[in-house]
């Protein structure tokens, strides 16, 4: 079953090579015996690092990418962060190391999991998860088995028909929400419009993973139980960063934030378990009545997942919520900011969308969305300019040479490619300009590619068997939302966007999302 995903990754790699035509360079081959020893990798001492994270320390309230940049200035393109309790972390900002890391990740690429999440699943709620780790936090053969099982469900294009209708319905509700809350004079959204975008994303994910309509964009917007879920998802992002990315003091000291995070994870787990339990009951009733759809003829993604077992369905739903809610908010917000400040790009996108949506209320279908190259280029450029995090992590299964140093097996290695692609001119010319054309298959765009870029720098959904399992769902969600918004409204924003987001480990909104949505004529 993994062959489908490998083929998809080959296609992605070919597209990236097209973007970086001829510019990729092989990492310099250095014999392990000739490499400088691991102990010589520069970096702060354990005591220096602890002090830096304490109140008054240099890194106490510093965004992660700025911390990495400070260490980059002090120690060079590769440096080591010693662990307070656990595994060291080696950070490299040398693009020539990235291929070495990905090509040596092994059969079951190991990514350091969130230890608080491991504790929650293996200790706090052991009776629910029963040894299941999931796609985002799991590793090893158990992860590989689950990934192989769900790949055909989540990644096959033909399964998009199972959730297309739900996503279109949610998008239409979002348009109506905009018309209700915008100022009738200025056409602006209220200061807290980011909350509505977050609700759009959560509603969309639940419509796919749980086959459930929450009503977040309408009648159930202020429902206490649903708001509890929304707040719990925010806690997971904020508290997970504080407790897991920073030194893990929670292992040794009673910390209120740790208890709060456990309560928030309980809320999300119970919510998913309840709705999946209802779905399983419906499936059992259909089976007794003889009306259960045959395998391959299911009418929802949840129905397919539920054929495995309750734990699998719960874990996939939770993973989609954890990995999709805030990141997709940032991505969609970033694309809207970019389009609002680039009226020429917005006009070109509108022209393309009019080709499939001649009227504002024309229907979106799988068929008419197949050929939208400029829309997809806008999404890629938005993801490049507004990445959700600095990069990714891998644990090396055997010794490798990175930047001339021997990195020993079992070491966690991080890369900062996302930050580099968003901010560094040597990798992307006109780096802070929104230029979707750089992603089109046009030989005249070669000047929009940095001379030192490599094919392994733009991988926002990951690489290989560990690439994001929810990529197709997120792509479709964005394509539907942006198509409907641009077709119905002229999008504007009358304020600076230089500091639109703030970065901790994941990025969060930093300014009021006071977009203008001006109704278009037919």
Curated annotation (Swiss-Prot):
Stretches of the chain forming a coiled coil according to its record: none
Annotated Gene Ontology cellular component terms: mitochondrial membrane
Cofactor: heme
Family matches, as InterPro entries: CYP11_CYP27_families, Cyt_P450, Cyt_P450_CS, Cyt_P450_E_grp-I, Cyt_P450_sf
Transmembrane portions of the chain: none
Keywords from the named record: Heme, Iron, Membrane, Metal-binding, Mitochondrion, Monooxygenase, Oxidoreductase, Transit peptide
Protein name per UniProt: Probable cytochrome P450 12e1, mitochondrial
